[in-house]
């Protein structure tokens, strides 16, 4: 009934078997799942196809083989890859975190793409916060420690926004929240984008899926500042060494050193580009006031739209090692649900929605921080992301992504 809303957790399923010419039977699971906060009259009637494979293997069909069959069945071969630069957007994992995707998956994909004439490379942008991935040298070293290098990954590894996070393209978008997203140059200059995402919880966005991988991960350091903050950067005077690097590199002449040799920002000139935050090596130039989870997710959707604008794109997500928090941490807590499988789609919105629905429907693992925080609750069918991070609102991001035409939340789940 399209005139009524269905509450969170109301899942309607229909199991069918479609026989295609020359193909084995394919089980089709259609899920119509909407949130009571959504006006259903605004939702397009068409559904995107999301393809799924479980993690069961045989000696003649390992997970790499199954992932390859999955993406071929999902239609990746319809893209013309010949002589095209293909950015495989991935998270290399912060050293110490062991939940990130194994490089074997990237290597097999890169080899397949090259067989189709593509020029693939793995890429990610530098981080805004301090850590082992805040500049390209440390970032590449971290990637190498986690198994990502041109030999193991079978393709080049490129940090998209350069040595210090200052190499980016402003993509004209005129979005409701982001007018010209700052996208890492290597990602912006790529001809085709493929996201390969470890689906997990996230302490600010609710969960980290394809949109988060692209929209946040593909933003330059200054872009990440725009995503996280609703105000201009500020100077922590006690940390400032008076090195003058922010003064030299401010494109708007908005920073000077005062009589105490401390940096000061002229907010009448500051445009909030975040380059001072990217360049400062002493944690003196820092972010201003952080945005709400809703606004963060709105901006992530618009940044994703900028990255994918006018480009062929394809998306793969792994519901494995679903840790409660992001792979940006230097540790990973125990998984909150059992491993479920791998999904693929041309629609990143439908893909994220399908992944979220599957995690919500799954049982929680006893002994995880989720069951320890909610020991007396029935967690199968519960919104595990909201339970883990109650101040987040992941639904808002998907609804905004659908609103701006990035994809649709309704989908048909096809098991391969």
Question: Model regions: which residues?
Answer:
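Single conserved hydrophobic/aromatic residue that forms the stacking wall/gate
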Residues: 1-15
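N-terminal non-cleavable signal-anchor helices
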Residues: 12, 27-29, 350
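Short hydrophobic transmembrane-like helices used for membrane targeting/insertion
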Residues: 26-31, 43
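Aromatic (phenylalanine/tyrosine) cluster motif
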Residues: 33-35
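Extended, low-polarity segments enriched in aliphatic/aromatic residues
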Residues: 46-97, 101-105, 116-124, 129-416
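Active-site cofactor/substrate anionic-group-binding motifs, chiefly glycine-
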Residues: 107, 112
């Amino acid at each position: 009934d399209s005139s009524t809303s269905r509450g969170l957790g109301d899942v309607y399923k229909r199991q069918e078997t479609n026989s295609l010419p020359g193909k084995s039977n394919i089980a089709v699971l259609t899920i119509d799942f909407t949130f009571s906060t959504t006006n259903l009259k605004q939702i397009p009637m068409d559904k995107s196809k999301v393809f799924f494979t479980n993690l069961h293997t045989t000696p003649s069909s390992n997970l790499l083989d199954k992932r390859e069959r999955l993406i071929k069945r999902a239609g990746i071969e319809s893209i013309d890859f010949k002589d095209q630069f293909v950015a495989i957007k991935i998270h290399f994992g912060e050293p110490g975190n062991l939940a990130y995707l194994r490089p074997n998956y990237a290597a097999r994909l890169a080899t397949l793409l090259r067989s189709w004439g593509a020029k693939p490379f793995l890429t990610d942008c530098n981080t805004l916060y301090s850590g082992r991935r805040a500049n390209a040298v440390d970032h590449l070293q971290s990637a190498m420690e986690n198994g990502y290098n041109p030999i193991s990954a079978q393709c080049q590894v490129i940090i998209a926004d350069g040595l210090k996070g200052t190499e980016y393209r402003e993509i004209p978008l005129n979005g409701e929240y982001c007018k010209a997203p700052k996208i890492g140059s290597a990602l912006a200059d790529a001809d085709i984008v493929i996201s390969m995402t470890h689906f997990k919880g996230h302490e600010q966005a609710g969960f980290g899926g394809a949109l988060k991988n692209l929209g946040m991960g593909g933003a330059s350091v200054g872009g990440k500042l725009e995503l996280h903050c609703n105000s201009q950067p500020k100077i922590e005077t006690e940390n400032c060494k008076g090195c003058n690097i922010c003064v030299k590199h401010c494109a708007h002449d908005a920073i000077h050193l005062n009589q105490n040799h401390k940096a000061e920002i002229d907010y009448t000139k500051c445009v909030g580009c975040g380059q001072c935050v990217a360049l400062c090596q002493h944690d003196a130039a820092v972010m201003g006031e952080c945005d709400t989870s809703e606004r963060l997710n709105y901006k992530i959707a618009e940044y994703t739209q900028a990255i994918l604008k006018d480009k062929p794109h394809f998306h793969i997500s792994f519901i494995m090692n679903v840790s409660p928090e992001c792979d940006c941490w230097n540790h990973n807590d125990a998984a909150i649900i059992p491993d479920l499988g791998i999904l693929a789609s041309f629609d990143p919105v439908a893909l994220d929605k399908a992944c979220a629905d599957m995690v919500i429907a799954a049982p929680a693992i006893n002994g995880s921080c989720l069951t320890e925080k909610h020991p007396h609750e029935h967690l199968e069918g519960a919104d595990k992301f909201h339970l883990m991070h109650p101040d987040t609102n992941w639904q808002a991001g998907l609804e905004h992504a659908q609103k701006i035409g990035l994809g649709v939340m309704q989908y048909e789940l096809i098991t391969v």
